[in-house]
From Swiss-Prot:
GO terms for cellular component: extracellular region; Golgi lumen; plasma membrane. May play a role in the cell adhesion to the extracellular matrix. Glycans are attached at residues 30, 61, 79, 90, 148, 155, 163, 218, 225. Residues 258-334 are cytoplasmic. The chain crosses the membrane at residues 237-257. Residues 64-104, 304-334 are annotated as: Disordered. The lineage of its organism: Eukaryota, Metazoa, Chordata, Craniata, Vertebrata. It comes from Homo sapiens (Human). The gene is MUC15. This is Mucin-15. PANTHER family: MUCIN-15 (PTHR45427:SF1).
Amino acid sequence: MLALAKILLISTLFYSLLSGSHGKENQDINTTQNIAEVFKTMENKPISLESEANLNSDKENITTSNLKASHSPPLNLPNNSHGITDFSSNSSAEHSLGSLKPTSTISTSPPLIHSFVSKVPWNAPIADEDLLPISAHPNATPALSSENFTWSLVNDTVKTPDNSSITVSILSSEPTSPSVTPLIVEPSGWLTTNSDSFTGFTPYQEKTTLQPTLKFTNNSKLFPNTSDPQKENRNTGIVFGAILGAILGVSLLTLVGYLLCGKRKTDSFSHRRLYDDRNEPVLRLDNAPEPYDVSFGNSSYYNPTLNDSAMPESEENARDGIPMDDIPPLRTSV
């Protein structure tokens, strides 16, 4: 039982060395998981005080080893042929990894340059479903600058019962980020894609050119000039003013002519004969100041001289009668 506990502690120590470059958070998670596994295996069996002391000492060794791993001297990556050193451990996968599931590729920081080909068969129990479907070309050469990179590298090769090996590469990055040229990878073949994912996809860019149709329209109707309504208003105003002025002028001239003609007609107009004959009955009628006698006996027009008392009656009767002596005799026809 004590030997099993030592083996587990050694495996946790080795695993902590591997995961020391990932950061403080990954170290705490891994150590707590491994310690939890140790406690699960040792739940049902009593452990002596010596084994507990050994566990405490092993925990102290784990913390010191983590500090040493974090302060380990950096490796010069360009001096190596492939930039990766392999460390093999003889411990089995059951004791070294526990219930953890191995991954095919572990990448930590953005400046990490890593290419990995998984050799695990598909029907192996530890085959991961997250394996990359495309593998890099074996002749892929990373183009690196001549700068010396201060990165620490830890590799581990785990052997499984199915004779399949998994290589895990871990690079710890320094706080300073050196300039690195991008990796040049030559693909070994065309990408295999499903036909369903590219339905309706066209490899070329379609360009649609619109050909405008020329349509000539009268711009005066669509966009009338703003000065045209003003001109039309001016023309209509001029015509209306001319008509109104003509009417007023004619009426004014008519009024002036009427006034001039009225002044000329102010004098009284009377019909006068060129000679005055008092024996005419019309003149007697016009000059009669009093009403005349209309009796049958005296049917002549009124004459004031006839009513004079100084005149004899014979003369009055003679004037009143019609003289018949001057009538010539009628001539008989032969």
